[in-house]
Amino acid sequence: MGGISIWQLLIIVAIIVLLFGTKKLRTLGTDLGESVKGFKKAMNEDEPKDAEFKSLNKDESATAGSEKVKDKEQA
């Protein structure tokens, strides 16, 4: 009733293909896909940096614990 049927969607797609042509739509899809891949790659590159900080924090806590033991031994 108020929604768009499959036939209406097919007509809209056919009009878009006629207006822009398949070659232009293909290049547009390729450009869009490459930009999404680049965005995902940039998001994945940020994650290991966070992991490095977490590992540094663990190392610092281990050295802080050993320093406390040394302080107790000296006292």
Swiss-Prot record:
The keyword Transmembrane applies. It comes from Mannheimia succiniciproducens (strain KCTC 0769BP / MBEL55E). Its main location: membrane. Part of the twin-arginine translocation (Tat) system that transports large folded proteins containing a characteristic twin-arginine motif in their signal peptide across membranes. TatA could form the protein-conducting channel of the Tat system. PANTHER family: SEC-INDEPENDENT PROTEIN TRANSLOCASE PROTEIN TATA (PTHR42982:SF1). InterPro entries: TatA/B/E (IPR003369), TatA/E (IPR006312). GO terms for biological process: protein transport by the Tat complex. It comes from the Bacteria. One of its GO terms (molecular function) is protein transmembrane transporter activity. Keywords: Cell inner membrane, Cell membrane, Membrane, Protein transport, Translocation, Transmembrane, Transmembrane helix, Transport. It is found in: Cell inner membrane. Residues 50-75 are annotated as: Disordered. HAMAP family: TatA_E. GO terms for cellular component: TAT protein transport complex. It is a single-pass membrane protein. The chain crosses the membrane at residues 1-21. The keyword Repeat does not apply. This is Sec-independent protein translocase protein TatA. The Tat system comprises two distinct complexes: a TatABC complex, containing multiple copies of TatA, TatB and TatC subunits, and a separate TatA complex, containing only TatA subunits. Substrates initially bind to the TatABC complex, which probably triggers association of the separate TatA complex to form the active translocon. Belongs to the TatA/E family.
